[in-house]
């Protein structure tokens, strides 16, 4: 997948339905991306690269598109795929996954089952047993990879405001969150809006 030559918002939409795979010593985990958020760097008041801020924790965000930027929030590991050329701190947060392979071990890792397994940015990374050390690695050159050939395509994509971003002016409500409409693994989805997962793909 091209992470560099198109707008980050387009990449965030294009990632919906892409298969994510993580392999540890014992297990292969996989699933389809159902929710993403775009973070637009220098001018995005909610982005870790806003204003060109550089600290050791955000070093990976300034690397070339296709780098994994992993950061911890409230003890949860959040995984972003960096976009754009080196030096431009933009990326896509992978917020939720519809699980495919390794579900029994995901239940063990999360001590949960059903939609709760992977319906949030810290939930799916724990389900997949992804370590913090993934930060800075290159997608598909490490244990975390994406498969754009064996993927799904959303029937409909919903654009909405990103989750948990108060007090950022215009950026609080910009529609930079992208979800597969009706997919029950999307975070914060109302039960009345949920469809059978299979009905949410073409």
Swiss-Prot record:
One of its GO terms (molecular function) is alkylbase DNA N-glycosylase activity. Keywords: DNA damage, DNA repair, Hydrolase. One of its GO terms (biological process) is base-excision repair. InterPro entries: Formyl_transferase-like_C_sf, MPG, MPG_sf. Its EC number is 3.2.2.-. NCBIfam families: 3mg. Belongs to the DNA glycosylase MPG family. This is Putative 3-methyladenine DNA glycosylase.
